[in-house]
Amino acid sequence: MPSLFPIEECDMDRLYEIEQAAHLVPWSLGTLKNNVGERYLNLKLVEKEQVLGFAICQTVLDEATLFNIAIDPVQQGKGYGSFLLQGLMDKLKEKGIQTLWLEVRESNPARFLYEKLG
C-alpha cells in the first residue's frame, strides 16, 4: 500500500524525473527546489521504497493552492493520483485549511480527478 511523506531535498532528482515524464510543459529543477518552505505542504507518494508521485501545495492562512501534482506515467491509471490528492486534502484539513485552489486546463485529463474529489 502506498504512503505519503514530506518531500525532502534528497528527493528532488527523482521528482524532477517524474515531472519531466508526466507534464508536456514541465517545471525546471530550479522551480521544484524553489517551491519549498514553511508555507508549503509538499508530499511524495511512496510504495515499496520507490517515489511514484508528488504534490506541491502552498498554504496561506486557511487556504491552499495546489501548484503541481504528478504521478510517474508508468504508474498512472492505478489510483495513485486519487490517493495522493485525497491524502493531501486530509492533511490540509488537519492544519485547518478550509479551501484548496488549483488551476487546470480543460484539456487536462486530471481535471476529472479534481472534479471527482470535489
Protein language model regions, located:
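Conserved acetyl-CoA-binding loop of GNAT-fold acetyltransferases
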Residues: 115-118
